[in-house]
């Protein structure tokens, strides 16, 4: 089994936290130099992976929000969204309480489309490792 690790990229550490918890194969789309070939590979992986995970840790993850809603419509049974409020290096939380409500609405929308919605990386890892 393989999972695509989509979602927030810029200055987010969630992949470093999740990857050691996974007992399955994964595709990490984050690269230092994004090219059209990288975009093509990402689209291929979203099609071929057993699950596509979108973890949102910042409210400005607008493209990731579009991707998760797109996938929750096109392939709801293999789409997972996780909204988690990451702690920044300065000790503050990355997402305000108001913005958490907005992202929660995105998660609930994806869930209504038939996708899975989790609120922690632990829940995501437990689910994927038990599939």
What is each residue range found by the language model?
Residues 1-131:
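Conserved catalytic or regulatory cores that recognize and/or transform ribose-phosphate-containing ligands
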